[in-house]
């Protein structure tokens, strides 16, 4: 993804100054997809760009899920911020003052059947620009150890050998912390969806990491792994 968080969401390289990001997951029925994308890329991306130019956020992105069923999310928004104050300030989403358009005229709320929002803190990242990403969600038995090992072992290993990736990062979830939900995510970004699929199939050699305790830290592995592809970023 082009700038996941330099994102995202949660592919790309926007995390240089980012500390926080939110992901909004939505389920858009197929018959609404074209209108949903039109409104988001034509209007809401401009509002986000205005916010970015005025120092209120770092980036905004829209990605679509590759595959999946009709009963789950198929699009996600990624908003990237420097501070928690920025991330929780909903007043910045004001099309009337920014574009001179009434919010109801460009609302997409009626175009999706379900929505969920999560907030995250960036714990580690390596910059790069791609067009697709694998989002890996998990619930480690030891959250602090998971973050520490990614920062001290996996991050340095990927800096030497990205194993086909163009971007990588780790995020810790800050809300909706319940037993059935993930508490961390990592992202592996690639130049194309095809490369993301090859990665999932084990077709890229990966760096070797000594002294990893990840099988103890997260014995059940990732709880979900999803490929997403960029629709648009406010800042490429």
Question: What do the PLM-derived regions correspond to, one by one?
Answer:
Residues 18-236:
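Short S/T/G/P-rich N-terminal loop/turn motif that feeds into the first structured element of a domain
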Residues 1-21:
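Bacterial Sec-dependent N-terminal signal peptides
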